[in-house]
Amino acid sequence: MPTIKQLIRNTRQPIRNVTKSPALRGCPQRRGTCTRVYTITPKKPNSALRKVARVRLTSGFEITAYIPGIGHNSQEHSVVLVRGGRVKDLPGVRYHIVRGTLDAVGVKDRQQGRSKYGVKKPK
């Protein structure tokens, strides 16, 4: 516990909250252009080929974003919308690509949880 004299000398510093998605610059989503689309393997207990894209955002950041869902049409120079949200078993992947917007089409033949994968209601 500081003394009154110590508090006069230097005041208490407010706790700064660190953002988990700094590249979005406080925006809910950001537009970006894919510079590379590739697959990476997840951390230890899991095994797969996860689809990711290197994206250059309008904020100037170059980030790695996960492409959710089965199958995708994203390639180099595709314009995509990026939201925050990390992938737990992929270190360094802190963003998701939003399916069903801009150049990223929705997941084909998706019946449940459609809104998360940009799929319209089937007729």
Swiss-Prot record:
Pfam families per UniProt: Ribosom_S12_S23 (PF00164)
Family that this chain belongs to: Belongs to the universal ribosomal protein uS12 family.
Assembly information from the UniProt record: Part of the 30S ribosomal subunit.
GO cellular component, one term: chloroplast
GO biological process: translation
PANTHER family, per database record: 30S RIBOSOMAL PROTEIN S12 FAMILY MEMBER
One of the record's GO molecular function terms: rRNA binding
Protein name per its UniProtKB record: Small ribosomal subunit protein uS12cz/uS12cy
Highest taxon listed in the record's lineage: Eukaryota
Record localization: Plastid, Chloroplast
Chain's role: With S4 and S5 plays an important role in translational accuracy. Located at the interface of the 30S and 50S subunits.
Keywords linked to the UniProt accession: Chloroplast, Plastid, Ribonucleoprotein, Ribosomal protein, RNA-binding, rRNA-binding
